[in-house]
């Protein structure tokens, strides 16, 4: 069969198969065009889940009649010159409008501020008409009807109207988070479904609009910079988590992305504080030189490729962990909300059950302890003032000890208050200036012990055990090169490796804390991490996991009766210890109830 040139319509339909997968894809492309045009108000109207109608109206700069005729032609754009190395707009390929026009009934009406009248053009199944004069306001209205009517096979793969409408809503939410200065309105067949007024530079106010007030109340601000890359945004406290990753948003130079590297780094940052199967809520925005990121790696521009992925991964993990440490004594405010609901009289009517807390009350089961002997002695140690545990520094230790000597009235002014009682030999009730705090003594002390052990790991070289017979691990030569480049770092963590020929390394020492272990498996894991991310966290992660296991085993147990001075000492050390708001499994260590909440329970005004 002879080779022939495909028709322009068929070429556009092929492109549409990659660029326009569903109505939400078309909505994304049209909203991006509106934002690139400088719009401050964008209205999206849909019918039939976007399959019957999708209309995007903006107040951007509009187009001239000549530009309008070019806009519907493939690879015609005002956003790109001669290089892909410096892309500063959301769109740049010039594919969206011709792709949509090839599979739908497309009409565009537009006007610039300088023009007395607007212009309109229509494209039906790839066939266009000349631009014609039309009444129009400044800006652009793009109307898409009967999406995929020209490719009926694609319609068979569409989901229900409800599912397609939900996908469009998610696109609008992502765009609204990225552009707080823009007003977004989404309407369905008969009503407005989403409306986000512009919030200017107040990004947290926009987060509250999109993600709810609970996120605003439980968000930690992120702002860090490293080697020209800046990370900003908000991340939820560890105890404010979900059962899925739907509320994790990432942006690169304002572009919404679903990048595996960013999401992997987010998971790694929370690995020590959230139970397995739970997900943090976060909004992360990375700003860097456009020349350092390639946005042209996916038809939908949802993935990007960084020139230095290790830098970005390290920036995300470091910034989030620093923020969690800074705000580590915070627990989710939604815990108190759940407690308030449980006390409401109407809540206990027949057929109703108690609400499930936003954190995982039934966290993932503890993995089997491997080194009981290593943790022996923690539980038996004298705990009169808990002075042997969990002081992150000498200054905070002295402050905690001094705080235990405070008078009863003075103690109530501390953030976690003064201990008043112990319930069921497991929960400490403390009075604060404006309410009360209930502390899980085992979860709290577990965190204090873990922080002490982790500080010890980071403060000096980890003790190592020599292998009687070095273990030889065969690896590709480039993996060996990467491992040896980090050999000094591994030695500080107790893992001593040497080069053994061009395609192998010899393991001579392993961390003593890990006991008998699969040294070859660990080395291969480290090699894989270095190959993918240019950083190796597996060894440090194993050591910290063991420290968490030992801390759980060695903490003051549930069922142990504590004296008042012991309870107050625990409260003061929690205040002085980073990350004390949640235990090592991500559960909260305390819940706070304000006096106003308590008075409402008793009907007081």
Swiss-Prot record:
<dbReference type="InterPro" id="IPR013507">
    <property type="entry name" value="DNA_mismatch_S5_2-like"/>
</dbReference>
<keyword id="KW-0234">DNA repair</keyword>
<comment type="function">
    <text>This protein is involved in the repair of mismatches in DNA. It is required for dam-dependent methyl-directed DNA mismatch repair. May act as a 'molecular matchmaker', a protein that promotes the formation of a stable complex between two or more DNA-binding proteins in an ATP-dependent manner without itself being part of a final effector complex.</text>
</comment>
<dbReference type="GO" id="GO:0032300">
    <property type="term" value="C:mismatch repair complex"/>
</dbReference>
<keyword id="KW-0227">DNA damage</keyword>
<dbReference type="Pfam" id="PF13589">
    <property type="entry name" value="HATPase_c_3"/>
</dbReference>
<dbReference type="InterPro" id="IPR038973">
    <property type="entry name" value="MutL/Mlh/Pms-like"/>
</dbReference>
<dbReference type="InterPro" id="IPR014721">
    <property type="entry name" value="Ribsml_uS5_D2-typ_fold_subgr"/>
</dbReference>
<protein>
    <recommendedName>
        <fullName>DNA mismatch repair protein MutL</fullName>
    </recommendedName>
</protein>
<dbReference type="GO" id="GO:0006298">
    <property type="term" value="P:mismatch repair"/>
</dbReference>
<dbReference type="InterPro" id="IPR037198">
    <property type="entry name" value="MutL_C_sf"/>
</dbReference>
<dbReference type="Pfam" id="PF08676">
    <property type="entry name" value="MutL_C"/>
</dbReference>
<dbReference type="Pfam" id="PF01119">
    <property type="entry name" value="DNA_mis_repair"/>
</dbReference>
<dbReference type="InterPro" id="IPR020667">
    <property type="entry name" value="DNA_mismatch_repair_MutL"/>
</dbReference>
<dbReference type="InterPro" id="IPR002099">
    <property type="entry name" value="MutL/Mlh/PMS"/>
</dbReference>
<dbReference type="InterPro" id="IPR042120">
    <property type="entry name" value="MutL_C_dimsub"/>
</dbReference>
<dbReference type="GO" id="GO:0016887">
    <property type="term" value="F:ATP hydrolysis activity"/>
</dbReference>
<dbReference type="GO" id="GO:0005524">
    <property type="term" value="F:ATP binding"/>
</dbReference>
<dbReference type="InterPro" id="IPR014762">
    <property type="entry name" value="DNA_mismatch_repair_CS"/>
</dbReference>
<dbReference type="InterPro" id="IPR036890">
    <property type="entry name" value="HATPase_C_sf"/>
</dbReference>
<dbReference type="GO" id="GO:0030983">
    <property type="term" value="F:mismatched DNA binding"/>
</dbReference>
<dbReference type="InterPro" id="IPR042121">
    <property type="entry name" value="MutL_C_regsub"/>
</dbReference>
<dbReference type="GO" id="GO:0140664">
    <property type="term" value="F:ATP-dependent DNA damage sensor activity"/>
</dbReference>
<dbReference type="InterPro" id="IPR020568">
    <property type="entry name" value="Ribosomal_Su5_D2-typ_SF"/>
</dbReference>
<comment type="similarity">
    <text>Belongs to the DNA mismatch repair MutL/HexB family.</text>
</comment>
<dbReference type="InterPro" id="IPR014790">
    <property type="entry name" value="MutL_C"/>
</dbReference>
């Amino acid at each position: 069969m002879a080779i022939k040139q495909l028709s322009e319509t068929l070429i556009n339909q092929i492109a549409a198969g990659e660029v326009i997968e569903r109505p939400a894809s078309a909505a994304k492309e049209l909203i991006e065009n509106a934002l690139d045009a400088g719009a401050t108000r964008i209205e999206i109207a849909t019918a039939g889940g976007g399959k019957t109608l999708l209309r995007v109206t903006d107040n951007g700069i509009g187009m001239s009649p000549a530009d309008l005729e070019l806009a519907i032609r493939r690879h015609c754009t005002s956003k790109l010159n001669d290089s892909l190395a410096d892309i500063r707009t959301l769109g740049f390929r010039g594919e969206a409008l011709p792709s949509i026009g090839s599979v739908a009934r497309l009409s565009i009406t537009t006007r610039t501020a300088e023009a007395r009248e607007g212009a309109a053009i229509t494209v039906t199944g790839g066939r266009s008409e000349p631009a014609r004069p039309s009444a129009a306001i400044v800006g652009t209205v793009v109307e898409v009807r009967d999406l995929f009517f020209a490719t009926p096979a694609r319609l068979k793969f569409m989901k229900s109207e409800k599912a397609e409408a939900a996908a469009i809503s998610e696109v609008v939410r992502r765009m609204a988070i990225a552009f707080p200065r823009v007003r977004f309105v989404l309407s369905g067949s008969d009503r407005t479904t989403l409306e986000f007024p512009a919030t200017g530079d107040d990004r947290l106010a926009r987060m509250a609009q999109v993600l709810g007030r609970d996120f605003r109340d439980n968000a930690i601000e992120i702002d860090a910079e490293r080697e020209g890359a800046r990370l900003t945004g908000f991340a939820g406290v560890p105890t404010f988590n979900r059962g899925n990753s739907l509320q994790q948003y990432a942006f690169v130079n304002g572009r919404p992305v679903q990048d595996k590297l960013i999401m992997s780094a987010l998971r790694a940052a929370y690995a020590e504080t959230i139970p397995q199967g739970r997900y943090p809520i976060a909004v992360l925005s990375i700003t860097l030189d456009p020349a350092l990121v390639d946005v042209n790696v996916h038809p939908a521009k949802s993935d990007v490729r960084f020139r230095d992925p290790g830098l970005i991964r390290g920036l995300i993990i470091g910034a989030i962990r620093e923020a969690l440490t800074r705000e580590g004594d915070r627990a989710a405010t939604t815990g108190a909300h759940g407690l308030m609901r449980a006390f409401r009289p109407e809540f206990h009517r027949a057929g109703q059950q108690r609400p499930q807390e936003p954190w995982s009350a039934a966290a993932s089961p503890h993995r089997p302890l491997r080194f009981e002997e290593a943790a022996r002695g923690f539980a038996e140690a004298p705990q009169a003032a808990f002075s042997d545990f969990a002081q992150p520094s000498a200054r905070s230790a002295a402050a905690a000890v001094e705080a235990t000597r405070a008078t009863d009235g003075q103690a109530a002014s501390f953030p976690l208050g003064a201990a008043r009682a112990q319930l069921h030999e497991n929960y400490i009730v403390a009075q604060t200036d404006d309410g009360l705090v209930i502390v899980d003594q085992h979860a709290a002390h577990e965190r204090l012990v873990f922080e002490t052990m982790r500080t010890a790991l980071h403060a000096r070289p980890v003790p190592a055990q020599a292998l009687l017979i070095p273990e030889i691990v065969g690896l590709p030569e480039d993996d060996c090169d990467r491992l040896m480049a980090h050999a000094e770092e591994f030695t500080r963590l107790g893992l001593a490796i040497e080069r053994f020929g061009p395609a192998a390394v010899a393991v001579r020492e392993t961390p003593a804390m890990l006991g008998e272990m699969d040294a070859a498996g660990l080395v291969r894991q480290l090699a894989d991490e270095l190959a993918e991310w240019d950083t190796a966290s597996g060894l440090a992660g194993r050591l910290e996991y063991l420290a968490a296991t030992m801390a759980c085993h060695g903490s003051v147990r549930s069922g142990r009766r504590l004296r008042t001075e012991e309870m107050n000492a625990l409260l003061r050390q929690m205040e002085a210890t980073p990350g004390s708001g949640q235990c090592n499994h991500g559960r909260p260590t305390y819940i706070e109830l304000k006096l106003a909440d308590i008075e409402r329970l008793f009907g007081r005004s």
